[in-house]
Amino acid sequence: MYGKQKTSILFFAFSFLFFAFSQANAQNSIALLKYGGGGDWYANPTSLPNLIKFCNSELQTNLEVNHPTIEVGSSEIFLYPLLHLTGHGNVVFSQDEATNLRNYLLAGGFLHIDDNYGLDAYIRREMKKVLPECDFVELPFNHPIYHQKFTFSNGLPKIHEHDNKQPKGYGLIYEGRLVCFYSYECDLGDGWEDIEVHNDTQEKHIKALQMGANIVRYVFMQ
């Protein structure tokens, strides 16, 4: 009984911290999530700065271009309403990290996962540690995340070919709330990068930024 009471107390304490801090920082906060396992969490170094600049221009946000990098197990994740995770391969969350991320999501936080190719099997395994009661479900094309400032009637845009599969947007929904959006076979982050990095067309670059802006607006307007 004591263990359950202690867990509840910690959860509500984290919830209070999240809401208290997010009210003060929500206008200028997106964080890159650093994780273990070797799956290059640091991929796409120009992607978030470019997305933030685009949002500041198109959505009139006031986001800090010099975004923070936060470890999964850090209490600092509760300062940021939106976390971004990317990479190509293995992802490993310790049990403490999984619990920390779970508390963050249940307290109102949001996680965007962007498969930079090769992330799928690992992130699905690790997110089961975080929300074992939830499965990734493909979001319908009429979901509000595709219809913010920019309309994507067919869901995620295809930015990079990879396995030539259709891009899919998956979600983890906890008690009716979308807490995690997972962009798969799309590679939004590569599309956000400086054009010369991947030699993307201007059209793909803009489409990727527009979809990213939709995610940001969806999170900040919830």
Question: How does the language model describe each region?
Answer:
Residues F11-A20:
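Bacterial N-terminal signal peptides
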Residues A24-L82, T86-G89, V179, D187-L188, ...:
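Aromatic-Pro/Gly-enriched surface loop or interdomain linker
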Residues N62-I70, I113-N116, C134-F141:
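Surface-exposed patches in mature extracellular/periplasmic domains of secreted proteins
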Residues Q27-S29, K34-G38, T46-S47, D120-E196, ...:
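An acidic, glycine-rich "communication" segment
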Residues I30, L82-A121:
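Short alpha-beta junction capping motif
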Residues M1-F12:
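Bacterial N-terminal signal peptides that target proteins for export
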Residues V65-V72, S94-T99, N164-K168:
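Alpha-helical scaffolding within the catalytic cores
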